[in-house]
Each structure stands twice: as structure tokens, then as C-alpha cells.
């Protein structure tokens, strides 16, 4: 509360137009609104660890049809003619980043036009936080062809970037979703956040989950207009979550999705 109050005060003192806090906790979200900040409710797909001991334990919580679909996808993905490496800490070498940089540039160029991270960024995280990085790479004929970068939190695995130079059926799902789930289970993590968007994640065990952000806008009339929009958006997001929850792959009645 004190930190948010101070930040708002600095904005006012320096005549700044706005202040934004993204991906805050529910508690921070409520505190910020008490201080007059605008609250925004959004939605992502997260995988939640319900105390699973193995990936098969997770599969056993799914309906029979969804369980079979995932097994088929994994089988096809792992038959691409190469191998998948799951690397963290000192297992990650400097040369791995040269390959991942190529993947990152390819994805960025296709989706957003200009990748915003620099090559130096990957060298920097290698030196400063390698112990908090999970790099999952697909290798074929001694060449890395695809990969995903994840960051390891105290309770959560954060999936952030994916890219490839060769495309194979279901390899994206295997590297970004299923291997991430396996890592979370094996390392006692409570959640996997696989990034924004993607209703395709639903069938793979990632459930619709509310996310929160806070916004202070200095111009009062603009702030009121934004607030009106955020109220209607929040209602729409919560309706979407309610609808999507009915289509999760879990056995009916086995899980609380709140």
C-alpha cells in the first residue's frame, strides 16, 4: 500500500500522465483500487498442479477422450526424428543461446514485425540468472531446430518465448506445454503460466484464470472513460471464463476451477 501511494505521489509531483502495475496479485489489486487506481481483469490459461506425482497422475484427472488425445499428440511430437533436451542451470551453455536467438528472431518477425529483445539480453540472463532458466530444445541431426524459454519462479514456471526453424506436428505443444508440465511436477511447482492468449491450451490442461493489473491516469475525464470500459470488459472476461471452464478436459466434478 505504501509503495503504491508513493508511486502515485511521484506521478503527481512530476506531472506524469499515468502509472501501470501489471500482473499484480489479487491482494495488490484490491489495495490499489482502495487507493483510487483503476483495476483491470484479464484472462490467461494456466496449468495448476493439484499435487500430481507424475505426468500420468495429471492425465488420470482428464476425461478418457482428452487423455487419449494428449497421448497421441505426445507420441507424434516425439517421433519427429530427433531428441528433446530439457536444460536448466549449468546445463545451459553459451552456444545454446545462438540457436535460441535464431528461433526468437523467426517468431518475432512473423508475429510482431520486430523482435524487441537484443542478442545481448540472452547473454546477460545467461550470466546473471541461469539457475532460474529452463530451456527446452529440440535437436535433429546435431542441429537445434526449435525451443522454448521459461523462467523458474518460487512456485510458478513462466513460459515466455518459443521459436523454430523447422516445423513438425505437435512439437510446439510438446515443448511449450507438456514438457513444462513435467518439469513443474518433478520440481514441485504449483503452476505453469504459458503466456497470453491461446484457447488451444484449454484441451491440454491449461485452465482459464483471471489476471490483474492496476492503472492510475492523471487526467480525470480520461480516467473516468477508461474506468467505464474496464467495468464492461471485466464482466465480459468473467463470462468468457465461465463458458470456457465448461470445456476443460478434466473429469466432471473432479476439480474446482476458481
Predicted feature locations:
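Catalytic-site neighborhood detector that most strongly recognizes the C-terminal catalytic loop/helix
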Residues: 216-224, 228, 232-235
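Conserved acetyl-CoA-binding loop-helix of GNAT-fold acetyltransferases
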Residues: 1-9, 167-184, 193
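Conserved GNAT acetyl-CoA-binding A-motif
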Residues: 14-22, 184-196
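Intrinsic disorder at enzyme termini
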Residues: 236-249
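A conserved beta-strand-loop-helix scaffold within acyl/acetyltransferase catalytic domains
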Residues: 4-170, 215-216, 231, 247-258
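Feature representing long, continuous alpha-helical segments
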Residues: 98, 102, 174-182, 187, ...
Amino acid at each position: 500500500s505504501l509503495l503504491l501511494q508513493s508511486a502515485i505521489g511521484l506521478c503527481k509531483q512530476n506531472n506524469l500522465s499515468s502509472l501501470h502495475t501489471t500482473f499484480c496479485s489479487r491482494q495488490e489489486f484490491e489495495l490499489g483500487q482502495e487507493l483510487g487506481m483503476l483495476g483491470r481483469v484479464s484472462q490467461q490459461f494456466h496449468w495448476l498442479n493439484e499435487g500430481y506425482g507424475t505426468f500420468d497422475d495429471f492425465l488420470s484427472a482428464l476425461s478418457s477422450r482428452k487423455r487419449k488425445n494428449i497421448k497421441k499428440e505426445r507420441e507424434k511430437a516425439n517421433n519427429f526424428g530427433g531428441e528433446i533436451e530439457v536444460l536448466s542451470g549449468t546445463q545451459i551453455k553459451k552456444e545454446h543461446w545462438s540457436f535460441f536467438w535464431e528461433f526468437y528472431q523467426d517468431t518475432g518477425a512473423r508475429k510482431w514485425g520486430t523482435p524487441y529483445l537484443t542478442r545481448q539480453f540472452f547473454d546477460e540472463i545467461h550470466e546473471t540468472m541461469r539457475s532460474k532458466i529452463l530451456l527446452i530444445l529440440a535437436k535433429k541431426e546435431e542441429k537445434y531446430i526449435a525451443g522454448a524459454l521459461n523462467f523458474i519462479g518460487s512456485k510458478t514456471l513462466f513460459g515466455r518465448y518459443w521459436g523454430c526453424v523447422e516445423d513438425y506436428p505437435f512439437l510446439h505443444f510438446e515443448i511449450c506445454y507438456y514438457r513444462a508440465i513435467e518439469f513443474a511436477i518433478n520440481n514441485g511447482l504449483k503452476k505453469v503460466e504459458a503466456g497470453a492468449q491461446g484457447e488451444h491450451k484449454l484441451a491440454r490442461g491449461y485452465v482459464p484464470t483471471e489476471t490483474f493489473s492496476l492503472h492510475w491516469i492523471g487526467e480525470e475525464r480520461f480516467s473516468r472513460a477508461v474506468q467505464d470500459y474496464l467495468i464492461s470488459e471485466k464482466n465480459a472476461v468473467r463470462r468468457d471464463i465461465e463458458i470456457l471452464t465448461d470445456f476443460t478436459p478434466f473429469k466432471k466434478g473432479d476439480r474446482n476451477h476458481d
